[in-house]
């Protein structure tokens, strides 16, 4: 079962396998390494992204390949400390008065110290976005576990681009690639 193979392995093992495969194919002139949607299985908090095991390991990889930029898929979490900043997809933290949102994200790790995060804008109905949330949210606990997050993910209405020294990249995550309007502009499309 592909869901068991991907989502039942611990995040360190999956990352180590990804890095091992990458090292066998990288050289000093490689400028971009791509990882697929949800390649990073670690729960990555955006406010502490540089403390993430996965980001540290990918930074170590970059130290061996100084021109390398990395675009990789991940599930990221954003802490919301103000009740006024909550969204319709925000979830309450257990035992705390804070909320958070979960995103299907593309993380761009520059060859410098910068890290940019793109949040998927077009969510898959029924999988990443529950229709009629007030009516259907109580049913989330009955959803089939396919290795992901139950309930609606957060989204942004921003169509970010990432830049390397000689290229502009517009990441599209999975289902977004069917939306032609997301691909406009003077950028190279990369679907993860």
Predicted regions and their residues:
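Hydrophobic beta-strand scaffold positions of dinucleotide-using enzymes
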Residues: 34, 190-192
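Soluble catalytic regions of membrane-associated enzymes that act on cell-envelope
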Residues: 1-126, 161-166, 171-183
